[in-house]
Amino acid sequence: MNIKRAKEEIEHTVKAYLAKDALGEYAIPAIRQRPILLMGPPGIGKTQVMEQVARECGVALVAYTITHHTRQSAVGLPFIRQRNYGGKDVSVTEYTMSEIIASIYAKMEATGLSEGILFIDEINCVSETLAPTMLQFLQCKTFGNQAVPAGWVIVAAGNPPEYNKSVRDFDIVTLDRVRRMDIEPDLPVWKDYACAAHIHSAILSYLELHPQNFYQINADVDGTQFVTARGWEDLSNLLDTYETLGLQADEDLIREYIQHPKIAEDFSAYLDLYYKYRDDYGVEEILAGQAKPAVFARLLQAPFDERLSLVSLILAGLGTRFTASRQADAVADSCYAFLRETKKALATVPEDIPDGSAEMFHQQIMDYDTETQQKRAAGLLSKDALTTRLQVLAVLRGWEGELRRANAAGTQEAFDLLRGQFQSLADEREKAQQTASAALEAAFDFMEQAFAESQEMVVFVTELTVDPVSHAFLTENGCERYFKYNKDLLLDHRKAALQQELSAEQRRHGGV
């Protein structure tokens, strides 16, 4: 199965294992809660999926790469204790709590979450001395003499033997106690994630042209050459930062992430062209509705991959504006909800307390900050959600400063001042939405003039549809031409599907 299907199955499993009956007991007893065993090539996204599942289910996550541990850290350290058995004093060996089990309790204490996921990576690559401990863990859900706490779902991951020489096969007794999921790389599924994760547009357009280069692991006399989903994502983060700093990524740098010489060389050449197209075609001018006439003349002679790269650049420019609009929306919505609570709280502030409104507002901000830090520590905030909360805090602190400088005479005056501050924020949101909408209209103007209803327009509309950020913007704000082309695209798709069905029917009955 692909990683998206695996994520859905794990999410459903967590909900099922943590469901309780009318008496407050787990509906599925712990002994029947089979650990999940994910088997798949390295760098496919197993660890990230666990982070997403934990965040979306609102539970804690403790993740370990077991190859980093010894038997002592997994089982605990031995110590001698005096016991009396049958009237005879004896010395017996006991063990301290496993470091892994202790980490679960520490996570529970730090986050306030009593339920979670224990994720053990590379479980079938452990040393010979640790192998029996891992078998005991999967079969009995214990490390040494310490059981995994109730309410914690066990997920383990490993690599097939063709990807790791250290792999140890599990026996049938162990496999009969786990739920095994075999995961394979899947570019279309990864693209859904990549759009939401803001993977660099050059990488997405390159893989659109060369899908076979998404994931490869090849072994020859020179060693293992590979490229993984993790490599592309990590490279994307670096490219974004390099662009911000005005630095240039060369082939040597790309090889550090894409450890497949031919693919690294090919992508490096493509990246150079990508930046060249961005400058030559003037993408920002296109999105401002000021495309140069020479651009259209050049496109008439341009090969398909160059035209597709330009479409990708236009989509990337739109994506930046859509993201800014969405972020402005999220910040404004959060601040509005905050002000509603502020209005309620102000009603409880006595009018005769100096700076009472400002002090109350300050305490609200402190509470929001504390909540943010707690959720951050628990891993319950996505990158976008954390960014929104940090921006909200910055806005609220600015409002607090205005409130203190104004020295409002009463609670109503204080709230009127805050409401005025919010109106400025709402104006900024409206401006971001208008900027994005204007750029989208300019993009359609250019696409119609340059490509009409060709394959490039199909790609453009399709990418607007599948990208979650652009799709959310279009759903919220609309665009007449997008809906027109999208409708035509759906009709063409249905006609093509119907034609295929008719052709298949004719072959069956006509002997063609």
Please give the residue ranges for each predicted region.
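Terminal-proximal interaction/regulatory segments of ATP-powered molecular machines
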Residues: 300-512
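Generic hydrophobic, helix-prone segments enriched in Leu/Val/Ile
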Residues: 10, 100-104, 242, 433-443
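AAA+ P-loop NTPase catalytic core and its hallmark functional loops
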Residues: 1-212, 217-220
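Alpha-helix capping and helix-coil boundary motifs
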Residues: 2, 184-186, 243, 303-304, ...
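Alpha-helical lid/collar subdomain of P-loop NTPases
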Residues: 196-355, 359
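Charged/polar, solvent-exposed surface patches and flexible loops
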Residues: 8, 12, 16, 55, ...
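Conserved, well-structured beta-alpha core segment at the onset of a catalytic domain
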Residues: 25-34, 43-46, 242-257, 512
